[in-house]
Structures are given as C-alpha cells and as structure tokens.
Amino acid sequence: VTVRSLLAVGALALSLTALTAFTALCPAQYALIAQPIPVAERFAVTEWRLPATSPPFAAILFVPATWLPVATLKAVVVVGNVLLLALLIRLSWRFATRRPAMTTATAAAPAPATAPVPVPVPLPVLVAAGLWLEPVFRTVLHGEISLALACLILWDLTRPDHALGKGFAIGIAAGVELTPALFIAYLLLTGRPGDVRAGLTALASLIGTMLLGALVLPRSSLDFWTLRVFETSRPGEASSADNQSLQGLFARALHTPEPGVGWAAACVVITFAGLWLARRAVVRAGHGKWGVPAIALTALLVSPVSWSHHWVWCVPLLAVLLAEGRWRTAAVVALVFSARTFLLVPHEGWAELQLSWWQQVLASPYPLLALAVLAALAYAAYRHHHRHRRRRTAVGQLAAVRPLPLPQLPASNSSASTMR
C-alpha cells in the first residue's frame, strides 16, 4: 500500500460521500406519482408513467430486477454504476491508446497484440472526478443504464478483429435502446473485413433480440415495432432542456414543440456526415480512434430524444483527447459536461420555448459541442485532403521534368586508331 493509492481511495470515498449527501439533501427534480394497478388477486404492478420508449426485449432483461427489494435494488444500481464507470474509463483509455491495425494482418495471421498503455492517473481518482460529469452523475442518481450500454459497445469495439462473436454485444445494446444501432451501420461501412464481420454479427444479434421479444411478448412487440417506434414524441417533450438532441435544439431555437421538416433534413445531413467522417477516420488511420466518438455523437444528435444521461460518451471523448495530448480541449469538454448550464434556464410550463438567444446556448450545451467536434473533424479532413493533393501535384510536376539528353561528342582520331 502506497501513499498514492491511499490518496486515490480517499478521493473516491470523498466523492462518493459528497454524492450520497447531495442525493439525500437536494430536493427531487421530478414528482412521480406511483399508483398500484391490480393485475391479479395477490399481485399488483406500479405505474410510474415514465416518458420512455424501449423495445420489449429490454423489459425481458429487467425482469430479474423485480426479485429484489427496492432498497436493495437501489444499492445494487448505485454500486454497479460506479463499477461500470471504472470499467468505462479503462475501456476508453485502452481504446484511445491502441495502435493502428497492421494492413498485412489476416484471420490466419492476425496482427500481434501490443501491451496496453497504463492509465497515467490512479483509477479511483478518475472515478471520483468522473462521477461529477453531469451525464454520469445523472446516470447514477436516476439508476439509468447508459454506462452499461456504453461499456457493452466499447468492450466489443476494443476486441480483436478475429475474436469470436465480435459485434454480438453491440447488437444486444441496440436491442435495449435503438440509438446504438448506428454503430452497426458504422461497422458495415468501414470496409475493413473485421469490421464488416462484426457489423453482420451485430445485425444478427439485433434481429435475435427482436425475435426473442416477439416470442415472449408478441402483442407488445407488434405494437412497438409497428406503431410506438415511429412516435418520436412518446419519450418526452422535445423542447425540454433535458433533451440534448438536435430535435431539442431546433425546438427551443425555433420556439415550437414540433421542429418539423427542418429538423428532419438536418438529421439526414448530420447522419451522412457523421458516417463519412467515421469511415474516413478508419480508412486514414487504420483504427476508429476518432470514428467511434464521431458515431456516438452523431447518434446522440439525430436521436429524437437524447436525455442528458445518454451523453456518457463524453468519457471516451475525453480519453481520446487526453491520449493525443489535447489538454486544453479536454479541459473545455470536461467543463461543458460538468457545468449543468441547461438546468439554469426556466423550465416551468412552456418557458423553454421562449428562451432568448443567450439562453439558447445554456440550454443546448451538448448538441452544440457535438456539432463543434464534427465540424473540427470535417475541417481536419479537408486540410488533410488539401495537403495530400498539393503533395501529389508536386510529385507529378517533378516526374514531368525530364533531364535533357547530353550531346554526343565525336570520337577523336587517337581513340579511333586505338579502337582499330
């Protein structure tokens, strides 16, 4: 036991204590009225009227949660989310520091594995700090599954290309919440054989979750996949400041609860741009160090509703920035995800549809940051293409300049006689 490890554990304990105190002392942000609904003579379920839409497969997965008392379940969820944050930090750092795949690697002779780069800061310190990132904080506070889904996806993406069943976990994550399905399209479009295989596996896994849901809950599955999945307003009000998607940004900026065609057109453009940038990152660098954050941010932007706790992908984004030595940019990103500015704007009634221009910035920090990241990636791609074109032009000009042939001098008499 070293002093450094003791300080790290102390920092984590202090952070958890502060988190517990905050949870116990602060007033609840939402008042949810639970009403028991009798479903049998000795049983009842509780109707919380929560604004959420998930495939029936998700309901099947959460059946074991009903076996625990509520107090025990709360403790399990809090401790589990803290452990998942530690896992996400390790996976993010491993992903951000891995080397590009060798182009000569094949399934029979895969590229040799490299030793993982150790995390430069003790993990308990990073967990203690990460708990106060707003998306992580709200995931722990509300018992959300955002950290679990992010860990599933990132674990699958960091596995070797030849790993058995790579892509299966991504399909499971997409079967629980539809937003991760964009990762399947990303894998299929990279063009790398390993990614394409993983994408096909993920697609098969997603279809499997749909079939399982249809087998266990046939009526609910039919209702969800034919009706509910198209109700973009079902999860909640688009104009709510808690909705940090592109639809929420448009609804608040246009002062309308239904942004309509403009938002839909922007989503199409952002989707294609994000997929192109992510694919380009893989083709150019041999790995998806920037491709995965680009896809994650794109998925969160184009989803009709992206609650703030969905943005736990800020952890991999920070890991990539720190791995590249972009300390100032990482500090700005951490500040944006810790400031909680969208909680400062009025929330009563339809007040979020009447925000002034400067309040718009406070109300939409995450989508604005995501758009800035995608714009920066697009600018970097443009600069790289421009430099490559100039280099190719210069090489072509050098190749076009051929040396002039030397004039042939007549042979002298002495040399001619010698030759004879």
Identify the residue ranges that each predicted region occupies.
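Primarily membrane-embedded glycan-assembly and transfer machineries that use lipid-linked glycans
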Residues: 1-107, 113-166, 190-311, 354-361, ...
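Aromatic-enriched
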Residues: 22-26, 322-420
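Short basic/hydrophobic patches in alpha-helices and adjacent helix-turn junctions
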Residues: 63, 252, 299-303, 318-324, ...
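Active-site catalytic microenvironments for nucleophilic, acid-base chemistry
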Residues: 67, 187, 191, 319-320, ...
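Contiguous hydrophobic segments
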Residues: 144-149, 175-178, 241-254, 326, ...
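Enrichment for repetitive, rod-forming helical segments
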Residues: 151, 184, 316-317, 347
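Transmembrane helices and adjacent periplasmic/lumenal helix-loop junctions
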Residues: 170-187, 302-310
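Hydrophobic/aromatic-rich transmembrane helices and adjacent perimembrane loops
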Residues: 308-323, 367
